[in-house]
Amino acid sequence: MKIPRPLPADLTSKSFTTQEALDAGVSVGRLRYRDLDSPSRAIRVPRLETEHAFADMVRPITQVTPFSAASHATAFLLWGFPGFLPGSHEPGIHISRPHAMAIPRRRGVVGHRGQFFEDEITTFNGLLITSRARTWLDCARKMDIDEITVVADHLLRIPRPEFEGRSSPHCTMDELEEMLDRHWGTPGIRKARLALEQACVGSDSAPETRLRLALKWAGLPTAEVNVPTELSPGVVRQPDLAYREQRVAVEYEGEGHSDPEQIVRDIAREEDYSRAGWILVRISKGHMSNNARSAVAKVRRALEQRGWSPK
């Protein structure tokens, strides 16, 4: 039986729109699994008894292995991290124990051990698990720098209380930096440091982070990320990326933008930008293939139309 990838933690115990899920990095295919009810178009409600099946598989293993906690790829999945972690869906439950204990050895288990500070072990649905910050560091060894940044942006993102029921980010920049300082010799830490240097607080989704990084690596100017921008008196928009000097806005549009009501809102948004003399660059999943080559070209053309040129 194929186990569905766990939803982001913020979506596991409440109804949500498909756009909220897509913005959180959930795939369209994941939204079709039978563990999600659809009481109305574009609405999903988790069937909690099924949604927690993965945690229920992990919990007994940690219970019979003293001083252990879910970690590495298993914690990555349980926390619902975005980003590509090679091997994350391979068989085997990852658990860790302190250095002083033996490495866990049990059929179906991938054992680890390491140094753990008290605040690096927490609980998830009654299951002992490495904290989000520690999980981020543990998984950095296998990830590339940009994908580590995708996870860092997810942890640093300021949530929307009206939709997510929380007002604080999962982690602060200081907390992630402290995690690196504590474990300065651990494998992958150099990549994690480089990733944290290019992380930002404002990115709302994994595709937005990948787009921002692709534009950076292409040598385009640095954009403001999800900053409210007054287009004209009384008209404020919050583009995913804004080049205020060139009056160019960039929006990444997930599949939820095909909804008829969303199309109407998108047209109104584009009209606002046009009336204010801004260029709105709309990016979709199709533009992100081949290292976002098409997306970079679209943004570059818009900037050049406004007089920007490479130095």
Question: Which residues are covered by each model-predicted region?
Answer:
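Short gly/ser-rich loop at a beta-strand->alpha-helix junction or flexible surface loop bordering the NTP-binding
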Residues: 1-188, 305, 309-311
